[in-house]
UniProtKB/Swiss-Prot annotation:
Residues 24-44 form a propeptide. Expressed by the venom gland. Belongs to the neurotoxin 12 (Hwtx-2) family. 03 (juruin) subfamily. Pfam families: Toxin_20. This is U1-theraphotoxin-Ct1b. GO terms for cellular component: extracellular region. Transmembrane segments: none annotated.
């Protein structure tokens, strides 16, 4: 069980690193604007602070009024785009 958890955490970390590298590459090619990346980072940060992960597949809701928005969902305290 510990091995599976470690593999899952490392896989998620690699996915985040890959996603960030691809976003920087697209920004360098002027495909996306740097303001768009800043907005995505702000949404992820807000979500990671306010996300309460629920069990049994229930949707993720933030503490109080904050929620992931704009197609973002909270998984493992991160906002992920679906």
């Amino acid at each position: 069980m510990r091995t599976f958890t470690l593999i899952a955490i490392l896989t998620c970390a690699l996915l985040v690193i890959y996603h960030a590298a691809e976003a920087e590459e697209l920004e360098a090619k002027d495909v996306i604007e740097s303001k768009a990346l800043a907005t995505l980072d702000e949404e992820r940060f807000e979500c990671s602070l306010s996300c309460d992960i629920k069990k049994n597949g229930k949707p993720c809701k933030g503490s109080g009024e904050k929620k992931c928005s704009g197609g973002w969902r909270c998984k493992m305290n991160f906002c992920l785009k679906f």
